[in-house]
Amino acid sequence: MTNIRKSHPLFKIINDSLIDLPAPSNISSWWNFGSLLGICLAIQILTGLFLAMHYTSDTTTAFQSVTHICRDVNYGWILRYLHANGASMFFICLFLHVGRGLYYGSYMYKETWNVGVILLFAVMATAFMGYVLPWGQMSFWGATVITNLLSAIPYIGTKLVEWIWGGFSVDKATLTRFFAFHFLLPFIISALVLVHLLFLHETGSNNPTGVPSDSDMIPFHPYYTIKDMLGALVMILALLMLVLFSPDLLGDPDNYIPANPLNTPAHSKPEWYFLFAYAILRSIPNKLGGVLALVLSILILILMPLLHTSKQRSMMFRPLSPCMFWLLVADLLTLAWIGGQPVEHPCIIIGHFASILYFLLILVLMPIMSIVDNHLLKW
C-alpha cells in the first residue's frame, strides 16, 4: 500500500513542499529566513485576529479601545506587544532575506524575486496602515504626512488624496478603511507567499556558491526542518525578550498621546523600518521628486537581474563585489539613522550624500565592480 503522505492529494502537496523536497546540501543559515517570515506572518495574523475582536475603528474610541485591550482584556497587553514587536521582527527577517538574495544572486530566479518585491510592498503597506490604528499623535500625523504625498501626482493628486481620506482630512472614514485594509492585506500576503513558494519550487533553491546543485541534493526533512526549528526558537526567544523586557523600545512615546489635529508633534517620523525610505524622501527638496525617489528606493530591486554583469551568480568567490555590498548595507544603516534625526545641519547634507550613494551603488558601482571582478578572475 502506498504511503498516504505520497498518495493523498492534499498531503502530497505538503510532502513535496516540506518533507521529500530535494534541497541543496550546502545551504547556510541565511536560508532560514523564509521559514522565519512564515512564522512571523502566522504570529501577526493570530495576534491581529484576537486584537481585532476588541478594537473599535472609530476616532472617538480607537485610542481607548487599545488602552482597554492592554488593561482589561486577559493577556491583552501581551497580544498588543507581540503584534507591535512582531512587525519589527517581521521586517528584520525581511531585510535579511532580501540582503541574502542580493549577496548570493537569488534574484536570478526572476519570477520568485518579482513576487518577493510585490510582497515587500504589500507588507510595508500593511505595516503603515497598522501604525495608524492606535490613533495616537504619530498615528494621525504619520497618516496625514504619508497620504498627503500622493497629492504630488500631477492632475489627479489632490482628488486621489481626498478619495483615500474619504473627506477633506484624515478622519473617521480614513481610520475605518485603514482598519479594513489592514485586516484584509495579510490574507492577500498569505496567497502571494504561496505563489512565491510555487515559483521557488519550480526552479529549486539557490545555494551559497551560486553553482547548480542538482547532483548533490538531500531531502528537506529531517535536515532542514530541524535547522528551521532552531532558527524559529532563536527568533521567538528574541521576540519574547523584546516583548517582556522592553516592549516600547522600538515604538514612539508620542503615540501614547491621543491624536490631536490641532497639535503637530515636534518631529514626525515613521516606525524604524521605514526610516531609510523616509530619509531618501526628505533628502529631495521637490515633493514629486521625493515621492518618486521613495517608491524607486524599493522598486529598484526589480532591476537587479538586469543589472547583473558578473559571470558568477553569487558574490561568495568575487574579490571586490562584496565590498560594494557591505558599503550598501552601511549606507542603508546611515539612511535609517538620518531618517530618525531632525531636519537640520549636518543631518541634511549626510542624507543627501547617503541617498545619492544608495542609487549610485545599485545602478552604477555594483555592476561596474562585477565587470572588474570578471577581468580580475580572467573570466
UniProtKB/Swiss-Prot annotation:
Main localization category: mitochondrion
Statement: the UniProt record of this protein carries the keyword Mitochondrion: yes
Note on cofactor: Binds 2 heme b groups non-covalently.
Heme recorded as keyword: yes
UniProt subcellular location: Mitochondrion inner membrane
UniProt-annotated binding residues for a ubiquinone: 201
Membrane topology label: Multi-pass membrane protein
Membrane-crossing segments per the record: 33-53, 77-98, 113-133, 178-198, 226-246, 288-308, 320-340, 347-367
Keyword terms: Electron transport, Heme, Iron, Membrane, Metal-binding, Mitochondrion, Mitochondrion inner membrane, Respiratory chain, Transmembrane, Transmembrane helix, Transport, Ubiquinone
Gene Ontology biological process: mitochondrial electron transport, ubiquinol to cytochrome c
Positions that bind heme b b562: 83, 182
Function: Component of the ubiquinol-cytochrome c reductase complex (complex III or cytochrome b-c1 complex) that is part of the mitochondrial respiratory chain. The b-c1 complex mediates electron transfer from ubiquinol to cytochrome c. Contributes to the generation of a proton gradient across the mitochondrial membrane that is then used for ATP synthesis.
Assembly behavior: The cytochrome bc1 complex contains 11 subunits: 3 respiratory subunits (MT-CYB, CYC1 and UQCRFS1), 2 core proteins (UQCRC1 and UQCRC2) and 6 low-molecular weight proteins (UQCRH/QCR6, UQCRB/QCR7, UQCRQ/QCR8, UQCR10/QCR9, UQCR11/QCR10 and a cleavage product of UQCRFS1). This cytochrome bc1 complex then forms a dimer.
UniProt family annotation: Belongs to the cytochrome b family.
Name of protein: Cytochrome b
Native species: Pteropus vampyrus
Gene for this chain: MT-CYB
